[in-house]
């Protein structure tokens, strides 16, 4: 969790990555061959989280289609002991740098700066999120935390028997949604 021990929250690694997605989106949208009124973002896991962050920070994006978005609801993931997979770094951080959890509240406050659920209400794009309810890499509760805070048009495709894996038929749903931009 690079930047977590820096006193300046602006130095959090993922803050910089979020801003890189903005630069990329705006660069692409400024190209002559791109219709800036028909731009979408798509990604899964970390790419899903970054896609939602980008959609929140670039309101011109029309569609955000993601599956099992990572980078959300760190504190709840910690409290429910779901720190496997994508969130394992939380456990590693505390074991290595704060084994007695004397700074736990400070750590989760700082992680709030890079928690996509806190950006979700800024999203203007139409959103679709694919969730596998058996996902033990990015807990569904973290994904619902983001989804529930999105105020724009949204829908969720729920796969009860799927983990953090390809969601059968989800790509077709995404393509149908993206077809709206053609």
Task: Report the location of each language-model feature.
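Acidic catalytic loop of the alpha/beta-hydrolase fold
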Residues: 133-138, 164-165
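Short beta-strand/loop motif that positions the catalytic acidic residue
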Residues: 123, 129-131, 135
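Short alpha-helix in the alpha/beta-hydrolase fold that links the catalytic acid
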Residues: 125, 139-148
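Hydrolase active-site cap/lid region
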Residues: 53-101, 158, 166-169
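Short glycine-enriched nucleophile-adjacent loop
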Residues: 29, 42, 48-59, 64, ...
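Cap/lid segment of the alpha/beta-hydrolase catalytic domain
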Residues: 1-19
